[in-house]
């Protein structure tokens, strides 16, 4: 009996470590708060509210001049019963967040449109990246009338853009897990 208990202690310790690590990781998790699509002029457009959470290590790296990058990935998929869903459209919005110590400003650059916005606080900069409005995702004419379509969205932190010494820390440290999970919803294919 004692031998069984002794052998299970490492497993118990490992389970506790995994549990506490996952609780700790969720504190910094980026997420999709709200998302919707609507039909405007024969085109479906997306509106989304995102929520970025920063760890102390990410904030420190940013303040030391390390730019941080995110890709917001959006997919429109046609549901198929006996095969994988077919991706009809893909979109990406790429943001670069950087702190300029000389100006004491946070700079957000949309890498797709090259639009740059300056903010005096990190919170304001993150809010600037957190709102998507009227993003065209698919033409109504590309949709089959009786098919079911799904839209997926994910915020992907690009840890490969970090300097090499930080990239090794990212693998082992939950404070650098700044991506979201996929969020999926049904695209209402309006017939009128």
Placement of each model-derived feature along the sequence:
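Glycine-rich, aromatic-bearing surface loops/beta-hairpins
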Residues: 137-192
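Bacterial N-terminal signal peptides that target proteins for export
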Residues: 1-12
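Structured domain cores in non-transmembrane regions
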Residues: 58-125
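Cleaved targeting-peptide boundary
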Residues: 24-33
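A beta-strand/beta-hairpin structural motif
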Residues: 46-52, 99-101, 107, 111-114, ...
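Generic short beta-strand segments
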Residues: 49-55, 73-77, 155-158
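Short, solvent-exposed beta-strand/turn "edge" segments of beta-rich domains on protein surfaces
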Residues: 36-46, 58-66, 82-86, 141-144
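N-terminal signal peptide c-region/cleavage motif recognized by signal peptidases
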Residues: 20-22
């Amino acid at each position: 009996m004692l031998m069984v208990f002794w052998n299970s202690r490492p497993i118990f310790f490992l389970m506790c470590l995994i549990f506490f690590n996952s609780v700790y990781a969720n504190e910094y998790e980026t997420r999709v708060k709200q998302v919707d699509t609507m039909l405007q002029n024969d085109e479906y457009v997306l509106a989304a509210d995102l929520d970025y959470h920063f760890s102390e290590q990410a904030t420190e790296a940013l303040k030391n001049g390390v730019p941080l990058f995110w890709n917001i990935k959006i997919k429109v998929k046609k549901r198929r019963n006996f095969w994988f869903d077919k991706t009809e459209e893909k979109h990406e919005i790429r943001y670069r967040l950087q702190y300029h110590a000389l100006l004491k400003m946070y700079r957000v650059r949309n890498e797709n449109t090259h639009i740059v916005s300056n903010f005096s606080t990190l919170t304001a900069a993150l809010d600037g990246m957190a709102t998507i409005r009227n993003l065209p995702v698919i033409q109504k004419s590309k949709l089959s009338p009786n098919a079911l379509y799904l839209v997926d969205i994910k915020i992907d932190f690009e840890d490969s853009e970090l300097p090499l010494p930080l990239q090794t820390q990212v693998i082992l440290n939950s404070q650098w897990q700044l991506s979201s999970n996929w969020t999926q919803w049904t695209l209402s294919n309006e017939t009128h």
